[in-house]
């Protein structure tokens, strides 16, 4: 019996073991699951931010452009955002869903520049953690995605 065991053992060593054990496969699957659990939430977060950037930010920027144009044409006037084409709608339909816009035009400066307090904020429906905010600073419009 002992000779049979030694012969079997020797042939196994000579042939070499091929393949993976069940434990090795389970460890690899566990590592992949851990990596996926970390990566998927980050991907979804990035996807929501991209939607706000694509759908809400252009609406806020358009409103700010109207405010700047109004101030260029009407120096010293008080801006009524409801009378501006791109600021008049508080909810705009987009391919990504409804976008809610709120704007503050402030008062135009006497040299035709927009007020530094002028701002437009757009929020995409269904995305609560990011908003598009456009401000007028240093004679230019700056839009950011805040979240």
PLM feature segments, named:
Residues 1-20:
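N-terminal leader/signal peptides at the extreme start of proteins
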Residues 15-44, 48:
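N-terminal single-pass transmembrane signal-anchor helix
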Residues 32, 60-61:
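Transmembrane alpha-helical core residues of multi-pass small-molecule transporters
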Residues 43-60:
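Aliphatic-rich helix starts adjacent to a transmembrane/signal segment
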Residues 65-147:
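Periplasmic/extracellular, small/polar-rich flexible segments of pilin-like filament-forming proteins
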């Amino acid at each position: 019996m002992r000779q049979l065991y030694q012969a079997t053992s020797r042939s196994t060593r000579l042939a070499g073991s091929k393949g993976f054990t069940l434990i090795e496969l389970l460890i690899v699957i566990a590592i992949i699951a851990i990596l996926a659990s970390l990566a998927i939430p980050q991907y979804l977060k990035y996807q929501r931010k991209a939607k706000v950037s694509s759908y809400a930010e252009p609406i806020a920027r358009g409103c700010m452009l109207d405010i700047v144009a109004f101030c260029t044409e009407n120096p010293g006037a008080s801006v009524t955002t409801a009378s501006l084409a791109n600021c008049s709608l508080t909810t705009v339909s987009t391919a990504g869903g409804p976008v809610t816009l709120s704007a503050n035009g402030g008062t135009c400066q006497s040299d035709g520049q927009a007020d530094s307090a002028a701002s437009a904020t757009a929020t995409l429906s269904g995305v609560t953690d990011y908003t598009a905010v456009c401000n007028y600073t240093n004679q230019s419009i700056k839009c950011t995605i805040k979240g």
